[in-house]
Curated annotation (Swiss-Prot):
Subunit structure: Homodimer.
Enzyme Commission code: 2.3.1.46
Keyword Nucleus tagged: no
Species of provenance: Salmonella gallinarum (strain 287/91 / NCTC 13346)
GO biological process: L-methionine biosynthetic process from homoserine via O-succinyl-L-homoserine and cystathionine
UniProt-annotated site: Important for substrate specificity, residues: S192
Name of protein: Homoserine O-succinyltransferase
The encoding gene: metAS
Binding site for substrate: K163, S192, R249
Function, as annotated: Transfers a succinyl group from succinyl-CoA to L-homoserine, forming succinyl-L-homoserine.
Keywords: Acyltransferase, Amino-acid biosynthesis, Cytoplasm, Methionine biosynthesis, Transferase
The keyword Acyltransferase is assigned to this record: yes
Catalysed reactions listed for this entry: L-homoserine + succinyl-CoA = O-succinyl-L-homoserine + CoA
Family statement drawn from the similarity comment of this UniProt entry: Belongs to the MetA family.
GO terms assigned for molecular function: homoserine O-acetyltransferase activity; homoserine O-succinyltransferase activity
């Protein structure tokens, strides 16, 4: 799907250089179809980098996707220019009366922070409750998975003693599930988290269906049977260099991090890493857009299927 964004968004030129199909709002009206409306709640500090990563994955199908970027943290950003936020992001009050086909909630570097200590925790709760009645399908990524499990299912925060960082092998549990359609039996995906997602915990305390696990038995991909919510505990959107950037940042901060697993060639941080998960990430987001959003969303968004309760 060509993603539809404002002409001036920096991602337009960045992604076009990669031959990603981006349609600006000035061109889009020439196609007489209703674009899918997808809201991205971007919780990552480096918002422009994160925009590029997610927009790349949303761009590779035949329908238009109308992207709206959302922020809920009113504090001044140290990593993203205020002008960018003011020009390209909306506040929740701007869209709370609208309906959307899809919502993506990104990760956030909050793995060691208690939920109630997160500055925008009340706003997270507000958005997730709102989404029940205003969004066809929501996709949670990494830390957002942990937050959603707490808000929607009452599951306490589960934290690892050491950070999981690297590129790990996974296997699918339901090869005929729509969200894993076309996946290889085993596939690679990056992780960068303190959050812990034991598969047994998901099975015991939710009615969610686990679709893929790590080799160590952690849940990687799971979803509700009605397709209204889906969860991915890793970072399939990451660029080839993202884990390297996090590793060297932590080295400079004196945190003595472990070298990300199965990432640098020959396990040597001086070697340039390669993305071995790109096809998986593209297929995951294409499947979500097609089977969890496009196939079940109403043509007229004024007539939503209400509530997950």
């Amino acid at each position: 799907m060509p993603i539809r964004v404002l002409d001036e968004l920096p991602a337009v030129n960045f992604l076009r250089e990669e031959n990603v199909f981006v349609m600006t709002t000035s061109r889009a009206p020439g196609q007489e179809i209703r674009p899918l409306k997808v809201l991205i709640l971007n919780l990552m500090p480096k918002k422009i980098e994160t925009e590029n990563q997610f927009l790349r994955l949303l761009s590779n199908s035949p329908l238009q996707v109308d992207i709206q970027l959302l922020r809920i943290d009113a504090r001044e950003s140290r990593n993203t220019p205020a002008e960018h936020l003011n020009n390209f992001y909306c506040n929740f009050d701007d869209i709370c009366d609208q309906n959307f086909d899809g919502l993506i909630v990104t990760g956030a570097p909050l793995g060691l922070v208690e939920f109630n200590d997160v500055a925008y925790w009340p706003q997270i709760r507000q958005v997730l409750e709102w989404a029940k009645d205003h969004v066809t399908s929501t996709l949670f990524v990494c830390w957002a998975v942990q937050a959603a499990l707490n808000i929607l299912y009452g599951i306490p925060k589960q934290t690892r003693t050491d950070k999981l960082s690297g590129v790990y092998e996974h296997h699918i549990l339901h090869p005929h599930a729509l969200l894993t359609r076309g996946f290889d039996d085993s596939f690679l995906a990056p992780h960068s988290r303190y959050a812990d997602f034991p598969a047994a915990l998901i099975r015991d305390y939710t009615d969610l269906e686990i679709l893929a696990e790590t080799e160590e038995g952690d849940a990687y991909l799971f979803a509700s049977k009605d397709k209204r919510i889906a969860f991915v505990t890793g970072h399939p959107e990451y660029d080839a260099h993202t884990l390297a950037g996090e590793y060297f940042r932590d080295v400079e901060a004196g945190l003595n991090p472990e070298v990300p697993y199965n990432y640098f060639p020959k396990n040597d941080p001086q070697n340039i890493p390669r993305a071995t998960w790109r096809s998986h990430g593209n297929l995951l987001f294409t499947n979500w857009l097609n089977y969890y959003v496009y196939q079940i969303t109403p043509y007229d968004l004024r007539h939503m299927n209400p509530t997950l309760d």
